[in-house]
């Protein structure tokens, strides 16, 4: 019943240009509360106030005035403009309603049907189409150049993860496509360590500029991560190829709504052992939230945390959870040492823990709650015990690569 009602109201408002005296009566307190809730639920910024003004048409017929909306010069101008210009009202309403109904559908490439608008809107996070192809030989050559550039495995994996892990399955935003990690606001996020990020991006851009063929920075970032993982697996004794799907474009700053992207900034990323501050929610619960936004399963989350630790991707290079002497090598050392019964874990300040040798009392490693939940939670510990087995090292490498590719391609809707 709701859909026909919506269609009818749209038809009345747009085709017959009927706009009520709503804009002169102004709004009741109930309207204002609905307006605020719409702002939160639809990720609409306050400069989109048109949306709130128009949608309140459907809320109630109450005409109790709200002095702020009547007297505030900004709100009054908007209301009066719509009252005096019904065509502008109809256009803004159509756009605002379209935005509200499609806000969680992701980019325009996910839309289906003959009525998809040709115009791309900035809130759809547009990305230029790719117009190049590379052969397998050219991709292999690119990998070699990246590995010879002086960037470490940690540099390449951290940057690729930072770019791709912004993806949110809840509204299909974020991800590596577009390479917005090099643009504001992502390039300045604390979790991305701007100084280190700038160093890596500068090297990748130099490689891009030296190429005879066109390739996007977005593809180079992901390819760099793939090359680094292949090297780390080879150092562990496994000759593997990380699948790579070409076709990411580079968005521009003009195609990026800074205010809209600020809400994607992570307050916590357990995969990089990062947390902005202490929250009422535990660090391990924030890890679960991050994992579900990335559409990861429990095994996928588990292998990714191990791999990220042993590859040295911790925020600011901390050693918490880095349970290995072979940093940069893709091993299951994190799992093996987490299960070490020769140490006793004791709490420290700041939500950290230290492992002391049961015989000598020497501190041998430190960890966060995120690290230790893989030993304390029954489901996660069962997974850890599987991957810690000597005969499952190759399985771990294969499963890590599969989970890694899932994150790298999370926003590649063109591959579905």
From Swiss-Prot:
Highest taxon of source: Bacteria
Record-linked CDD domains: catalase_peroxidase_2
Subunit structure of this chain's protein: Homodimer or homotetramer.
Cofactor entry: heme b
Broad class of enzyme this protein falls into: oxidoreductase
Source organism phylogeny: Bacteria, Bacillati, Bacillota, Clostridia, Peptostreptococcales
Organism: Alkaliphilus metalliredigens (strain QYMF)
Alphabetical UniProt keywords: Heme, Hydrogen peroxide, Iron, Metal-binding, Oxidoreductase, Peroxidase, Signal
Alphabetized InterPro entries for the sequence: Catalase_peroxidase, Haem_peroxidase, Haem_peroxidase_sf
Signal peptide: 1-20
Family as reported in the entry's similarity comment: Belongs to the peroxidase family. Peroxidase/catalase subfamily.
Bound cofactor: record note: Binds 1 heme b (iron(II)-protoporphyrin IX) group per dimer.
Catalytic activity: H2O2 + AH2 = A + 2 H2O; 2 H2O2 = O2 + 2 H2O
A GO CC term assigned to this protein in UniProt: cytosol
GO BP field: cellular response to hydrogen peroxide; hydrogen peroxide catabolic process
Role this protein plays: Bifunctional enzyme with both catalase and broad-spectrum peroxidase activity.
Protein name per Swiss-Prot or TrEMBL: Catalase-peroxidase 2
EC number: 1.11.1.21
Xref: Gene3D superfamilies: 1.10.520.10, Peroxidase, domain 2 (1.10.420.10)
GO function term, MF aspect, one: metal ion binding
Post-translational modification: Formation of the three residue Trp-Tyr-Met cross-link is important for the catalase, but not the peroxidase activity of the enzyme.
């Amino acid at each position: 019943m709701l859909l026909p009602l919506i269609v009818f109201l749209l038809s009345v408002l747009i085709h017959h240009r009927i706009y009520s005296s709503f804009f002169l009566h102004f709004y009741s307190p109930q309207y204002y509360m609905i307006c605020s809730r719409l702002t939160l639920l639809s990720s609409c910024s306050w400069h989109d106030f048109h949306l709130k003004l128009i949608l309140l048409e459907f809320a109630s017929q109450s005409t109790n005035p709200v002095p702020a909306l009547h007297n505030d010069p900004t709100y009054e101008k908007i209301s009066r403009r719509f009252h005096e210009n019904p065509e502008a009202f109809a256009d803004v309403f159509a756009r605002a309603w379209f935005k509200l109904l499609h806000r969680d559908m992701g980019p325009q490439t996910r839309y289906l049907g003959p009525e998809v608008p040709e115009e791309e809107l900035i809130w759809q996070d547009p990305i230029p189409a790719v117009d190049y192809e590379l052969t397998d030989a050219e991709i292999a050559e690119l990998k070699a150049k990246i590995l010879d550039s002086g960037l470490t495995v940690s540099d390449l994996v951290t940057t690729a993860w930072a770019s791709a892990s912004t993806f949110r399955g809840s509204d299909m935003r974020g991800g590596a496509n577009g390479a917005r990690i090099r643009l504001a606001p992502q390039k300045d996020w604390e979790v991305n360590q701007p100084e280190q990020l700038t160093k890596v991006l500068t090297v990748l851009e130099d490689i891009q500029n030296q190429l005879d063929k066109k390739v996007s920075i977005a593809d180079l970032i992901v390819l760099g991560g793939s090359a680094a993982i292949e090297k780390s697996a080879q150092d562990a004794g496994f000759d593997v190829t990380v699948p790579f799907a070409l076709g990411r474009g580079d968005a521009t700053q003009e195609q990026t709504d800074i205010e809209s992207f600020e809400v994607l900034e992570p307050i916590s990323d357990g995969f990089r052992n990062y947390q902005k501050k202490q929250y009422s929610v535990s660090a391990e619960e924030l890890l679960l939230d991050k994992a579900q936004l990335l559409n990861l399963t429990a095994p996928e989350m588990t292998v990714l945390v191990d791999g990220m630790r042993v590859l040295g991707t911790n925020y600011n290079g901390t050693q918490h959870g880095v349970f290995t002497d072979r940093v940069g090598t893709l091993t299951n050392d994190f799992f093996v040492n987490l299960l070490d019964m020769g140490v006793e874990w004791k709490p420290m300040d700041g939500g950290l823990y230290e492992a002391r040798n049961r015989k000598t009392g020497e501190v041998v490693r430190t960890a966060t709650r995120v690290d230790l939940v893989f030993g304390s939670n029954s489901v996660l510990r069962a997974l850890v015990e599987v991957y810690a087995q000597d005969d499952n090292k190759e399985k771990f490498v294969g499963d890590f690569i599969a989970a890694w590719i899932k994150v790298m391609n999370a926003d590649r809707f063109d591959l579905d």
